[in-house]
Regions:
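Short acidic-glycine-tyrosine-enriched beta hairpin
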Residues: 39, 77-97
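Short, well-ordered beta-strand segments in beta-rich or mixed alpha/beta enzyme
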Residues: 47-50, 69-74, 99, 111-113
Length: 158
């Protein structure tokens, strides 16, 4: 058996040690780490740490989302179930929801999101108020780290 090294280094297996990457503080009770951004497929992988009581703007996904919760609990206001530590949630394209972390949580809630496409952040009337996507999130992550005085992490897969 032989092992071939890919001609394109971006095709190689990559390991990211997320503990080595700094959290970017958004100032809204949400901490962020960008782990991967693939511009050719529109896929982005982020880690979020939500403080108790955080609520995100209602949004629509243009693609599917996979969510893995490693600590805490959260829910979408539109549904009657909670996503808890050890849970996996699939959100199909075009789903609309409002992520909420209960204020009575006793600690932070950590979630890894694998996102295809963009989030369309909606105004109360349902119109698109803003767009969150991989390129914009990566740019914001770098800007927040710079403002905090933290270096860009090594090993980020872009």
């Amino acid at each position: 058996m032989s092992i071939t090294t890919p001609a394109n280094p971006t095709d190689a297996v990559r390991l990211v040690t997320t503990e080595d990457a700094p959290w970017a503080d958004t100032g809204t009770g949400v901490l962020l780490k960008v782990v991967r951004f693939d511009s050719s497929h529109g896929t982005w992988v982020i880690l979020n740490r939500f403080q108790p009581g955080v609520q995100l703007q209602t949004h629509r996904h243009t693609g599917s989302v996979d969510a893995f919760t490693s600590a805490g609990r959260w829910h979408d206001l539109e549904y009657d179930f909670y996503v808890t530590e050890g849970s996996y949630l699939y959100e199909p394209a075009n789903s609309v929801h409002t992520l909420h972390v209960p204020a009575e949580n006793t600690g932070d809630t950590d979630v890894c999101f694998i996102i295809e496409g963009a989030l369309l952040n909606l105004a109360e009337d349902g119109s698109v108020e803003s767009v969150s996507d991989g390129p914009g999130t990566l740019e914001a992550y770098y800007a927040l780290l710079e403002a905090q005085g933290d270096p860009r992490p090594n090993g980020l897969i872009v």
